[in-house]
Curated annotation (Swiss-Prot):
Residues 1-12, 78-86, 196-209, 273-274 are periplasmic. GO terms for cellular component: plasma membrane. Residues 34-56, 108-174, 231-251 are cytoplasmic. Residues 127-137 have a biased composition (Basic and acidic residues). The keyword Kinase does not apply. Keywords: Cell inner membrane, Cell membrane, Cobalt, Cobalt transport, Ion transport, Membrane, Nickel, Nickel transport, Transmembrane, Transmembrane helix, Transport. This is Nickel/cobalt efflux system RcnA. The chain crosses the membrane at residues 13-33, 57-77, 87-107, 175-195, 210-230, 252-272. Pfam families: NicO. It comes from the Bacteria. Induction: By nickel and cobalt. Transcriptionally repressed by RcnR. Residues 127-153 are annotated as: Disordered. One of its GO terms (biological process) is response to nickel cation.
Length: 274
């Protein structure tokens, strides 16, 4: 069977480019630091669309820089393993790490939603101790406050940002600094890009894949920032599927990562068996 790197050299890299763009876009939609931090920051400072775009691009640039450093480091290390016999084992090890990453992302999302549902159930159970009028008023307030799923880390960051920046005037430099620091957090998807770049063994294709991932991430972050500037609440009211899409994004991204891992694993195993 044709080797993984040979498939890329024969012009089949087009499959990985749109996949990297999609992976970056889905990563930006996941409940986590980048999206929640940006939306909370823009809402807290009552930012403009221009400031939202600036914040999104700054976060993307810093995130891209981290991915590039990891990717180039991986490609430099991979040059030491040029022996053809070592490549299948590297593919197999990479596949195990990628599939483990996908499983961790899926499990983390599932556990977060389960804990959220349990808290909702406990909160609803407490309402039975109130009279009907009090239950109705409090239940209505509860719907607006907790009706949308958010993981614990994202909620903590949002509350901290609101406390620090609510109603304050900020400069463009502060916005850029906030975006740059917010994009430095590593992510499982970046690890996947690293492992794929190691398999590519080609600087041009590796750089293209990293840029593609960053492009997808930029599209999501800028869109989220602009959406926060023009009121995310209005978007959610007009399109009921917005919140559902955001909640399901981690499942799609974990599935995509898992498929990449399986693909690598199959080729690595076939190479070892030859």
């Amino acid at each position: 069977m044709t080797e993984f790197t040979t498939l890329l050299q024969q012009g089949n890299a087009w499959f990985f480019i749109p996949s990297a763009i999609l992976l970056g876009a889905l990563h930006g939609l996941e409940p986590g630091h980048s999206k929640t931090m940006m939306a909370a920051f823009i809402i807290a400072i009552k930012g403009t669309i221009k400031q939202a775009v600036m914040l999104g691009l700054a976060a993307t640039i810093s995130h891209t820089a981290v991915v590039w450093l990891i990717a180039f480091g991986g490609m430099v290390i991979s040059k030491r393993f040029t022996a053809q016999s070592a490549e299948p084992w590297l593919q197999l090890i990479s596949a195990v790490i990628i599939i483990s990453t996908a499983f961790w992302m899926f499990w983390r999302t599932w556990r977060g939603e389960r804990n959220w549902l349990e808290n909702m159930h406990e909160h609803d159970h407490e309402h039975h101790h109130h009279d009907h009028e009090d239950h109705h008023d409090h239940g209505h307030h509860h719907h607006h406050e907790h009706g949308e799923y958010q993981d614990a880390h994202a909620r903590a960051h949002a509350n901290d940002i609101k406390r620090r920046f609510d109603g304050r005037e900020v400069t463009n430099w502060q916005i850029l600094l906030f975006g740059l620091t917010g994009g430095l957090i590593p992510c499982p998807a970046a690890i996947t890009v690293l492992l794929i770049c190691i398999q590519l063994k080609a600087l041009t294709l590796g750089a293209t894949l990293v840029v593609s991932f960053s492009l997808g991430l930029a599209l999501t972050l800028v869109t989220v920032g602009v959406g926060a500037a023009i009121s995310v609440q209005q978007v959610a009211k007009r399109w009921s599927g917005f919140n559902t899409l955001a909640k399901r994004a981690p499942y799609f991204s974990s599935l995509l990562i898992g498929l990449v891992g399986v693909y690598m694993g199959v080729h690595g195993f076939m190479g070892i068996m030859r």
